[in-house]
Regions:
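Transmembrane helix segments
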Residues: 127-179
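Transmembrane helix-boundary elements of multi-pass transport/secretion proteins
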Residues: 1-36
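Hydrophobic alpha-helical transmembrane bundles that constitute the permease/transmembrane domains
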Residues: 1, 33-37, 69-85, 113-117, ...
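Secretory targeting signals
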Residues: 77-106
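Hydrophobic alpha-helical transmembrane segments
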Residues: 22-26, 81, 101-109, 138, ...
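Hydrophobic alpha-helical transmembrane segments of multi-pass membrane transport proteins
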Residues: 22-83
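Junction motif at the cytosolic side of a transmembrane helix
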Residues: 9, 180, 188-219
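A structural motif at transmembrane helix-loop-helix junctions in multipass membrane proteins
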Residues: 105-144, 150-151, 213-216
């Protein structure tokens, strides 16, 4: 019933309350670009753990966490540039929308850092939980639900919207276009992004120390 109701209302007014169909399509586009540019760091680390390569990599003097994040960004940035050059001009021509490109790029970088740090934590957790596919599945679903990819956040109950916008999943997919188009406070989003990056970095460093300690104990 809901899809047909939405279609009927959109056909007459183009809006449902504060919901803008054009913006919703842009949110899905940017979210999908961010998702497709993800290197799937969790799966790569999981393979390292299962093959034992992680032991060799941990012996490298380079910080494991920073090396993984730098490598992920090295893949993400060129991929994002290619996708953006191909798709954004086409969609902008068909569905023009006002947004700040510099702000979009800044929060895209923040989103990439948060997304890769989450993937890093999931991958490293496989050192302690051999079958952690369930964790990855749940996080992936939360990322899509709170990242504006399933149901537009604006159509959710207000209390769910408030919760969604405080999560790292929102910051990883939906925040860049929301902030760039002025639908969410840039100052608030930047603060959230910095806090999440620092928190996730701390968790990754703590988990890395636990892995090293376990390796020493087990020889």
């Amino acid at each position: 019933v809901l899809p047909f109701s939405v279609f009927e209302i959109l056909r007459r007014t183009g809006k449902i309350s504060d919901f803008d169909a054009t913006f919703a399509l842009w949110a899905v586009l940017i979210g999908q670009i961010l998702h497709n540019c993800d290197i799937r760091l969790s799966k790569r680390i999981k393979q390292e753990v299962r093959s034992g390569d992680i032991v060799i990599r941990l012996m490298d003097p380079t910080n494991y966490v920073l090396a993984k994040i730098a490598g992920s960004l090295g893949f993400f940035l060129p991929s994002f540039a290619v996708y953006s050059i191909i798709f954004i001009p086409i969609v902008y021509f068909l569905l023009p929308i006002k947004f700040n490109l510099i702000v979009l790029l800044l929060f895209t970088l923040i989103a990439a850092l948060i997304s890769n740090l989450i993937g890093l934590l999931i991958g490293m957790s496989s050192f302690f939980i051999e079958e952690n596919d369930g964790i990855e599945l749940v996080v992936g679903k939360l990322m899509f639900i709170f990242g504006n990819q399933v149901i537009p956040i604006i159509l959710m109950p207000v209390w769910v919207q408030n919760i969604a916008r405080t999560t790292p999943f929102y910051m990883a997919l939906s925040a860049p276009i929301d902030v760039a188009s002025g639908k969410y406070s840039s100052l608030l989003a930047f603060g959230q992004g910095v806090i999440y990056i620092l928190l996730l970095l701390w968790l990754a460093s703590w988990m890395l120390n636990q892995i090293k300690r376990k390796l020493v104990i087990n020889g």
